[in-house]
Design a protein with these regions (language model features):
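Alpha-crystallin/small heat shock protein
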Residues: 1-110
Length: 110
């Protein structure tokens, strides 16, 4: 799927939270976007603007544009995201539905 780029991990950080980490070396914060569309988390990376102006004698570090999609389960929301040391971390939180107890009054027959 999508040639495996960029590589990513999904880890559970608590009973109700998860973290998706993508290896996005070479991409700045302005080159990345995160959206949620119809329960799909979509991470996109655009090639940095100065890529076209550079003449590479050897090109071993990939910085091509990408799109990665993750299906979010019901009740899972994006809690935040940050980028550091070439890794993009997307934190997810699963909301635990509150248990609502309703007492039904029993009336006498009509």
């Amino acid at each position: 799927d999508q040639n495996g780029y960029p590589p990513y991990n999904i880890e559970q950080t608590s009973d109700t939270s998860f973290r998706i980490t993508l290896a996005v070396a070479g991409f700045g914060e302005d080159d990345l976007s995160i959206t949620v569309e119809d329960r799909q988390l979509i991470v996109r990376g655009q090639s940095p603007a100065d890529e076209e102006e550079r003449l590479f004698l050897h090109r071993g570090i990939a910085a091509r544009q990408f799109q990665r999609s993750f299906v979010l389960a019901e009740g899972v929301e994006v809690a935040g995201a940050n980028s550091e040391n070439g890794l993009l971390h997307v934190d997810l939180k699963r909301s635990v539905p509150e248990k609502i107890v309703t007492t039904i009054k029993i009336g006498k027959g009509a």
